[in-house]
């Protein structure tokens, strides 16, 4: 032990021993935290530790415990000790009493000390003691020494004082606190060693203090709570007492305020220590005086209180409060707020005592008294110890040098030292460092009896003044265990092992008996977990088994509780009764007053209700008046709207008249036009003149037969002008007559209607000259077909919507003409129509044509012209621009066109395209904008290019022109310009922002480019650049996508700086008037400069004029008002709209025939179809009506109809293989024995091995040498096991103990012990026996002897030739023996080749042995390469590979059966029909397109075409877009490819397959629009042959039922609606039972009832039922179809909702703000206001008299009076 450690050990004043040294302390210390419990608890509560941590009572502790409060029995002794301490402090020269025990002489020494100018000396005894000699032995330790480093480096030993009074209470508290800190440091040291050194067995505190390792020396400087820097290791910081105490007081918050820090610093000054001592002395004197003369002190305090001034009292109170706060802060180490500035300690102790007495008397009950009382019982630590001040080198005025100190804290921990001196080590420097400048700590010590919950918690009875001997306990503890890997011998380990086995056996036995119920049974496979083991067990508690007295006490308590509850119930019931009686009498007292209040309240309620009724009546009358005024305003507004409509009609008529005049070149036509106009006006004045004119018309009609077409056209060119003037006259008459209809007009309309019904409409007769035919059939001329329309397939979806009646039919929709066979059949030309016609569409088209024809005949003059044309037998069908359709088809070289084709245009325009150019040129010449709405594929692009070429050639206007198109067709427009008008400089505006900025650079220069082509999206992105530039023509392609006037796109494009505007659309205009108004208003602002139409009508007026009549027409009811209104709308649209259909303008287009081919199901298809329908799951699915499940069922049935391999693949047949045959176990026993025992030479086989082990010969060990056997026995010593067995037999007697007894624990343990020993002995004997058997084996001769005796003869004799023939005589007689296996195989080979085709159901592997007998193993050896031992191979036949397997051919034929490839066709009825159809088509020179929905069907078709050897091409959804054009061009140019198989999901952009003239639909798509697009790929402009469409339908299946129902109800076109999304209309109209051909079931739910999906969700549902490839292809096709959706996505819809589109200047806005977005129909006539019938019941019968009086007086009814009163303005 080091000297430093010895010195530290002697610094303890009392040498007390911790409770851990007491007996049982080791166990108790394991239950508590060895580090934190005692110090933290002591600091937190200010009390001493509990019993288990309490030091043993020695002399010093007895003296400390006697210092009690004044109120306790030991108070007088405490007062004496306080007086002695006071005396010692007041007289520093007096030396303390010397101890009487044997101690060395101490020399007193005076040490001067200066505190605030005061000088005093303190005597310190220098004790010198000789160091005892070190003795060897485990029980003796070195005597501790203490070395105090000073200037002279003297060795000083502090004397242990025997008398407890010799130390002052302040010093005693200081020593106790230092001990606590030292103990904590020792425990931290021990805990550090336990955590760092896991295998720690013994712990020496003195040696631990010498630990200078790098782990422990990782020191970090930390600012301590008391303002100094404390040196603590990282490990010590976790267990710092000050930190733990502060965290407990402050809840973990350690940060102090500045004021608290300043107060602490002021409290820790040197002079404050002296002040504390003086105050302590004053307090003690005050306490002594209070006990003796309490009354006198109170009188003195009152006198002093009266004399002192108020300010002096407040200052002293603040000072006293600051002192108390600083004391608490020093004791708790927690920051507290100081209430005043710190005062200097200049006042005397007497004034301090007076101030404290004053504060005590003034603050009784408010907290100051508590502080005064605490000062009596608390003691403070003296920071400056006179005994250590002189000897230590610590200077309080200088910071403590931590680097010079070597820290050696000591911890007791669990393992206790051998002596008391080694346990406690105290250093003055350590105390001064931890508590510099006199830190004040308050220790409130109160002992509580320990809680005893275990017998081990009881303390040992040790005589007073004696110390228990802990060395024996420590040695016993250290010897109570041994380390298994270090301190135990083999014998001890075996004994330990035996004890553990016995313990486990006892535990298992107790578990079986149920004693240990908490533990799991190992036999059941359960065991304790690590967490359960670590959890441990609870300490035993007191037994809960009740005794008789417990029952008596419990009964008494229960009875007492019952009595108390009964008493409480009685009291509560009495209270309730008293309250009820009191409430009753109170109610009787105020009954009259309450009645009065209720009556007054009732009157108020009645008055309020009556006032509300009257006010409600006035409000109702006010609403009636407002409604009347509103109706009057609407009537006035309607009149203004009619007036405005008239102006618009007049402007439209003028524009149309100007157009017609421009078409007529000769002056003769103009003169005839004037004459006819005058004649029409005269005919309108008199009926007689009208009849004369009709006669003249008849004469003219007879002369028309002799006129040519040109003369007829010139003759009737002014019909439109006549019609316009007649319409103007009718409008003037309507305005003059008001709302009454003109009778003459009704009669005229009736006559026109009758004449129209009696006439026979005829189809226009195309009069085509041979030259014209050559023009359209010439291959050299560039025909402008529909190839330039890349979005034709996209526009085809909108054609299905044109069949609905309404505005679409009136603006150039399909006009199917009625055929009347009763009239003149000579003038009717029959068109070739489709084989499957849609009757409902024909009826709708006929109705539309009839309405259109009625609307166009709006004047009598037009009716006369129709009569004249009818007389000639040809009806001229007017189009939307007033030009007859007959003119469109009769443009021949004989008639010079009004507008010559521009020379910049390369190519020849068709007739209708030439007329389109003329119409567009007329729009430009008349300063009007328009809409070109030709059907898709008619060449709107080339007509637009020709218009721009016309402007460049005729008007010398090259641009700049802006063409805005969808993104997908930008490249197509550029290619068309380069193809047909290469003279234009075209700039395609696209790319990223940087590229677009480069293209805009210099574009304002003239002739940089002429035409700019861009997309809708880029226009919005670069709106600032496009809006600044002035454009001559702005052309919008796909203009139907800007029909929403609230969108940002519409509003942005509306304000572009343009001269003219043109809209292109292939979609017919819908019945939505708002969309129509949006397009028309988009065109109108351009006409504002010429004031032809000063702005278009606002949306409200437009809806009032046309919405109600259109709604009636859609609903089916057509009246005169509707017809008149629609005629006006048609007249407005005529100058701005041109729409033509294919069948009207293109008569050269080939016909289209559709055939339905019914295919029978094959036998396999019918089986699978019926089997699927008969399943219970299928029927249950159809009953539930779940849409997704039904779609899945339908998809499976369609797979069966297309090909059965799609539903269930034809399997590859193989045999079931078994190892043994069924008869193998039942073979005869004799045959089995013979096969094992008999060794045949020629036909049998010898055993492969000979075993002699059963005879005792270890022949298998002959490969081992004798030396190896000896070495093996040498290194496997069995003697050790034998010795171990003998030792165990000696230890455990062989005789068996008494029978196992469970009632005797000792006997049971003996039996268990003996059984365990016998078990171990038995196991060792078995090991010995096995070792002996293993070591007994040895070779008979050995390998070394055999090698010595072996002679190699291979080199002496040559090799013998192989024998190829058997030497047996019987083998040479071939006529007597059976044929060999090879001979049999050769003989049966032809039969096997021809007839071996049926694969057996099962085969076995041992049939060869059973069927071939003894030769079977030989065959297996030779042909299956099973090698036998060399000893048995006497005859060598040859290498096994050279012999052919005789069973190979039969195995190949019978082992596996692949389905024949020809079954692919014969398993499917559609493929059988397709084979014959393709044979006929190819023989006729036709080429076919085969479409299917499923991708797997394409795979089947590929196999089918490969079987037949036909060349084909394939296009499916996986084909890239760039490859599609290559495939289509190759197919169109290569006639050697007859078949093209495609998927309906392969997309529609850029596919033109006019090279084929036959379309075969192998199956129909879910979406019929897909099939329609497929037809359009072949049947389109450019096709020269008739197109035949074959649709394959499996009869008596779901496909035939769907087609049948579709033909009956016409629901096929209703599957698809707007935007290409699916709806449930198709499934709502057709039930599942109709599709499957089942009987109707009332329980089955319709599909629509269980389906509530939107279009997208429904599309996903259909995709789930399809294959993954088909679903992916459909997704790609939809994406391509909707490629331009993002261009027209209304991203700003919400922002622009309700926005009103304005004009380009300050002109009137198109909509009124209050009516923005209103779509309801306006009222055409004022609605009469119904007067509400309201009567007030007054409860009497005088109402009649009052009403009669009012009527007599002229006032009238009260309602009329109120209305009149409000109308006069008196109400507002």
Curated annotation (Swiss-Prot):
Residue ranges occupied by any Helicase C-terminal domain in the UniProt entry: 1470-1623
Keyword Nucleus on entry: yes
Compositional bias per record (Acidic residues), positions renumbered to this chain: 126-163, 282-323, 665-695, 727-757, 770-800, 818-847, 1740-1752
Biased composition (Low complexity): 61-71
Domain of life of the organism encoding this protein: Eukaryota
Compartments where located: Nucleus
Top EC class of this enzyme: hydrolase
Region feature Disordered, mapped onto this chain: 1-170, 282-402, 656-854, 1681-1757
Reactions that this protein is recorded to catalyse: ATP + H2O = ADP + phosphate + H(+)
Recorded GO MF terms: ATP binding; ATP hydrolysis activity; DNA binding; helicase activity; histone binding; structural molecule activity
Compositional bias per record (Basic residues), positions renumbered to this chain: 107-121, 338-379
Binding annotation for ATP: 934-941
Domain spans labelled HSA: 536-609
Alphabetized SMART domains for the sequence: DEXDc (SM00487), HELICc (SM00490), HSA (SM00573)
Limits of the Helicase ATP-binding domain: 921-1086
E.C. number(s) listed in UniProt: 3.6.4.12
Motif (DEAH box): 1037-1040
Any one GO CC term of the record: cytosol
SUPFAM superfamilies, per the entry: P-loop containing nucleoside triphosphate hydrolases
Keywords from the UniProt entry: Activator, ATP-binding, Chromatin regulator, DNA-binding, Helicase, Hydrolase, Nucleotide-binding, Nucleus, Transcription, Transcription regulation
Function (record text): Catalytic component of the SWR1 complex which mediates the ATP-dependent exchange of histone H2A for the H2A variant HZT1 leading to transcriptional regulation of selected genes by chromatin remodeling.
Subunit structure and binding partners: Component of the SWR1 chromatin-remodeling complex.
Name assigned to this protein: Helicase SWR1
Gene name per UniProt: SWR1
């Amino acid at each position: 032990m080091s000297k430093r450690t010895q010195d530290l050990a002697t610094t303890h004043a009392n040498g007390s021993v911790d409770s851990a040294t007491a007996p049982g302390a080791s166990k108790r210390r394991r239950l508590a935290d060895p580090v934190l419990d005692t110090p933290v608890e002591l600091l937190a509560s200010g009390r001493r530790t509990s019993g288990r941590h309490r030091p043993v009572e020695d002399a010093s502790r007895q003296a400390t415990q006697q210092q009690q409060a004044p109120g306790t029995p030991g108070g007088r002794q405490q007062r004496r000790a306080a007086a002695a301490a006071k005396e010692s402090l007041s007289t520093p020269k007096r030396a303390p009493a010397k101890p009487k025990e044997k101690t060395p002489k101490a020399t007193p020494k005076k040490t001067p000390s200066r505190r605030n100018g005061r000088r005093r000396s303190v005597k310190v005894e220098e004790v010198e003691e000789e160091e005892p000699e070190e003795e060897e032995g485990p029980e003796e330790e070195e005597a501790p020494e203490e070395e105090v480093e000073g200037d002279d480096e003297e060795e000083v030993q502090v004397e242990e004082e025997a008398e407890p009074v010799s130390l002052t209470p302040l010093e005693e508290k200081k020593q106790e606190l230092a001990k606590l800190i030292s103990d904590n440091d020792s425990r931290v040291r021990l805990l550090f060693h336990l955590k760092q050194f896991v295998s720690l067995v013994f712990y020496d505190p003195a040696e631990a203090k010498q630990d200078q390792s790098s782990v422990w020396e990782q020191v970090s400087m930390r600012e301590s709570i008391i303002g100094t820097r404390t040196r603590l290791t990282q490990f010590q910081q976790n267990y710092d007492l000050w930190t733990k105490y502060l965290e407990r007081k402050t809840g973990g918050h350690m940060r102090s305020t500045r004021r608290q820090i300043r107060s602490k610093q002021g409290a820790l000054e040197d002079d404050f220590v002296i002040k504390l001592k003086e105050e302590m002395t004053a307090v003690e004197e005050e306490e002594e005086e209070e006990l003796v003369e309490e009354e006198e002190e109170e009188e003195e305090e009152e006198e002093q209180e009266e004399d002192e001034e108020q300010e002096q009292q407040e200052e002293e109170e603040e000072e006293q409060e600051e002192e108390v706060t600083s004391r608490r802060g020093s004791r708790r180490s927690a920051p507290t707020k100081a209430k005043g500035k710190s005062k200097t300690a200049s006042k005397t102790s007497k004034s301090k005592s007076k101030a404290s007495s004053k504060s005590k008397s003034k603050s009784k009950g408010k907290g100051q008294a508590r502080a005064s009382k605490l000062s009596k019982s608390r003691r403070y630590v003296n920071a400056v110890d006179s005994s250590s001040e002189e000897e230590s080198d610590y200077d309080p005025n200088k910071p403590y040098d931590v680097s010079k100190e070597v820290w050696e804290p000591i911890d007791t921990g669990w393992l206790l030292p051998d002596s008391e001196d080694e346990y406690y080590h105290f250093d003055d420097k350590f105390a001064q460092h931890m508590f510099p400048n006199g830190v004040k700590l308050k220790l409130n010590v109160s002992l509580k009896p320990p809680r005893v919950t275990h017998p081990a918690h009881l303390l040992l009875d040790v005589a007073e003044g004696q110390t228990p001997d802990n060395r024996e306990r420590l040695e016993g503890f250290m010897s109570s265990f041994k380390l298994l890997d270090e301190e135990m011998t083999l014998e001890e380990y075996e004994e330990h092992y035996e004890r553990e086995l016995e313990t486990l056996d006892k535990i298992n036995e107790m578990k079986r008996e149920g004693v240990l119920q908490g533990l799991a049974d190992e036999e059941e496979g359960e065991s304790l977990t690590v967490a359960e083991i670590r959890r441990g067990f609870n300490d035993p508690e007191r037994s809960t088994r009740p005794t008789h007295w417990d029952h008596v006490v419990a009964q008494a308590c229960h009875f007492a509780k019952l009595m108390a509850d009964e008493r409480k119930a009685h009291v509560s019931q009495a209270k309730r009764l008293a309250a009820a009686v009191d409430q009753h009498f109170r109610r009787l007292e105020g009954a009259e007053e309450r009645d009065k209040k209720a009556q007054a309240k009732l009157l108020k309620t009645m008055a309020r209700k009556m006032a509300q009724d009257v006010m409600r009546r006035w409000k109702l009358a006010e609403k009636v008046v407002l409604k009347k005024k509103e109706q009057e305003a609407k009537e006035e507004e309607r009149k203004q709207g009619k007036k405005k409509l008239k102006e618009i009609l007049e402007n439209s008529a003028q524009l149309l008249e100007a157009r017609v005049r421009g078409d007529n070149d000769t002056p003769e036509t103009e003169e005839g036009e004037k004459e006819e106009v005058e004649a029409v006006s005269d005919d309108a004045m008199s009926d007689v003149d009208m009849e004369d004119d009709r006669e003249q018309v008849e004469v003219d009609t007879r002369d028309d037969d002799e006129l040519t077409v040109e003369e007829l056209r010139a003759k009737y060119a002014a019909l439109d002008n006549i019609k316009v003037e007649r319409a103007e006259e009718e409008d003037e008459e309507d305005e003059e007559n008001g709302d009454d209809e003109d009778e003459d007009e009704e009669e005229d309309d009736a006559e026109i209607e009758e004449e129209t019904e009696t006439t026979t409409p005829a189809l226009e007769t195309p009069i085509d000259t041979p030259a014209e035919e050559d023009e359209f059939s010439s291959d050299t001329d560039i025909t402008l077909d529909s190839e330039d329309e890349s979005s034709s397939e996209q526009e085809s979806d909108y054609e299905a919507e044109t069949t609905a009646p309404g505005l679409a039919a009136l603006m150039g929709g399909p006009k199917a003409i009625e055929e009347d066979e009763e009239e003149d059949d000579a003038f009717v030309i029959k068109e070739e129509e489709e084989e499957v016609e849609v009757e409902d569409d024909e009826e709708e088209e006929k109705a539309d044509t009839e309405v259109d024809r009625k609307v166009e005949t709006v004047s009598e003059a037009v009716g006369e012209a129709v009569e004249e044309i009818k007389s000639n037998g040809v009806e001229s069908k007017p189009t939307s621009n007033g030009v007859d359709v007959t003119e469109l088809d009769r443009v021949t070289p004989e008639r010079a066109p009004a507008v010559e084709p521009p020379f910049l245009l390369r190519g020849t325009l068709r007739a209708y395209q030439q007329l389109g150019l003329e119409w567009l040129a007329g729009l430009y010449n008349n300063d009007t904008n328009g809409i070109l709405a030709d059907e898709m594929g008619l060449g709107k692009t080339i007509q637009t290019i020709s218009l721009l070429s016309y402007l460049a050639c005729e008007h010398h206007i090259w641009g700049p022109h802006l063409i805005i198109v969808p993104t997908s067709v930008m490249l197509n427009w550029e290619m068309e310009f380069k193809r047909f008008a290469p003279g234009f400089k075209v700039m395609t505006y696209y790319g990223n922002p940087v590229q677009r900025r480069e293209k805009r650079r210099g574009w304002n220069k003239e002739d940089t480019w002429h035409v700019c082509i861009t997309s809708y999206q880029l226009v919005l992105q670069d709106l600032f650049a496009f809006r600044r530039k002035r454009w001559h023509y702005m052309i919008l392609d796909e203009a139907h996508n800007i029909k929403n006037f609230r969108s940002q796109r519409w509003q942005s494009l509306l304000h572009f700086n343009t001269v003219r505007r043109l809209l292109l659309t292939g979609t017919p205009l819908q019945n939505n008037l708002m969309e129509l108004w949006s397009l028309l208003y988009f065109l109108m602002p351009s006409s504002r400069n010429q004031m032809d139409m000063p702005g278009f009508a606002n949306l409200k007026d437009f809806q009032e004029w046309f919405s109600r009549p259109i709604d009636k027409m859609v609903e089916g009811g057509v009246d005169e008002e509707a017809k008149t209104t629609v005629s006006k709308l048609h007249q407005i649209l005529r100058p701005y709209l041109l729409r033509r259909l294919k069948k009207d303008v293109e008569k050269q287009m080939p016909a289209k025939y559709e055939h339905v081919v019914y295919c029978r199901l094959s036998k396999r298809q019918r089986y699978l179809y019926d089997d699927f329908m008969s399943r219970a799951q299928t029927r249950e699915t159809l009953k539930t009506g779940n849409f997704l499940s039904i779609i899945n069922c339908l998809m499976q049935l369609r797979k069966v109809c297309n090909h059965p391999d799609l539903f269930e693949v034809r399997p590859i047949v193989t045999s079931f293989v078994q190892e043994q045959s069924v008869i193998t176990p039942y073979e005869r026993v004799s045959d089995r024995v013979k096969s094992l025992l008999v060794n045949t030479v020629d036909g049998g086989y010898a055993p492969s091995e000979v075993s002699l082990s059963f005879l005792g010969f270890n022949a298998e060990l002959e490969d081992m040498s004798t030396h190896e056997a000896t070495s093996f026995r040498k290194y496997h010593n069995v003697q050790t096991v034998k010795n171990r067995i003998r030792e165990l037999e000696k230890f455990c007697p062989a005789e068996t103990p008494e029978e196992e007894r469970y009632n005797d624990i000792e006997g049971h343990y003996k039996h268990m012990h003996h059984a365990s020993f016998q078990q171990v002995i038995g196991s060792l004997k078995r090991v010995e026996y096995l070792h002996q058997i293993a070591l007994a084996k040895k070779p008979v001769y050995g390998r070394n002897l055999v090698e010595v005796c072996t002679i190699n003869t291979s080199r002496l004799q040559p090799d013998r030739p192989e024998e190829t023939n058997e030497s047996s005589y019987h083998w040479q007689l071939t006529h007597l023996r059976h044929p060999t296996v090879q001979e049999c195989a050769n003989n049966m080979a032809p039969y096997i080749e021809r007839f071996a085709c049926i694969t057996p159901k099962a085969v076995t592997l041992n049939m060869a042995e059973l069927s071939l007998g003894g030769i079977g193993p030989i065959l297996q050896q030779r042909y299956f390469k099973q090698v036998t031992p060399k000893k048995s191979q006497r005859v060598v036949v040859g290498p096994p590979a050279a012999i052919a397997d005789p069973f190979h051919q039969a195995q190949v034929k019978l082992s596996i059966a692949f389905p024949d490839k020809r079954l692919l066709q014969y398993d499917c009825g559609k493929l059988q029909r397709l084979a014959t159809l393709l044979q006929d088509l190819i023989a006729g020179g036709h080429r076919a397109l085969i479409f299917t929905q499923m991708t797997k069907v394409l795979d089947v078709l590929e196999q089918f075409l490969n079987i037949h050897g036909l060349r084909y091409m394939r296009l499916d959804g996986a084909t890239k877009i760039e490859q599609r054009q290559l495939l289509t061009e190759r197919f169109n140019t290569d006639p050697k490819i007859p078949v093209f198989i495609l998927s309906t999901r392969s997309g529609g952009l850029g596919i033109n397959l006019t090279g084929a003239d036959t379309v075969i639909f192998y199956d129909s798509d879910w979406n019929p629009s897909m099939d329609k697009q497929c037809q359009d790929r072949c049947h389109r402009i450019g096709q020269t042959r008739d197109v035949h469409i074959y649709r394959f339908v499996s009869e008596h299946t779901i496909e035939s039922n769907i087609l049948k129902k579709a033909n009956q109800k016409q629901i096929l076109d209703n599957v698809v609606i707007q935007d290409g999304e699916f709806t449930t209309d198709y499934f709502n109209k057709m039930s599942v039972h109709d599709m499957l051909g089942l009987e109707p079931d009332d329980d089955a739910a319709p599909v629509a009832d269980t389906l509530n999906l939107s279009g997208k969700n429904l599309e996903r549902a259909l995709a789930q039922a399809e294959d993954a490839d088909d679903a992916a292809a459909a997704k790609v096709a939809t994406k391509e179809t909707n490629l331009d959706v993002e261009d027209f996505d209304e991203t700003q819809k919400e922002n622009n909702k309700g926005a009103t589109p304005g004009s380009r200047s300050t002109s009137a806005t198109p909509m009124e703000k209050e009516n923005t977005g209103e779509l309801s129909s306006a009222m055409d006539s004022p609605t009469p206001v119904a007067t509400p019938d309201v009567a007030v019941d007054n409860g009497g019968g005088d109402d009649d008299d009052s009403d009669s009086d009012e009527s007599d007086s002229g006032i009238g009814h009260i309602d009329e009076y109120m209305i009149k009163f409000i109308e006069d303005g008196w109400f507002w």
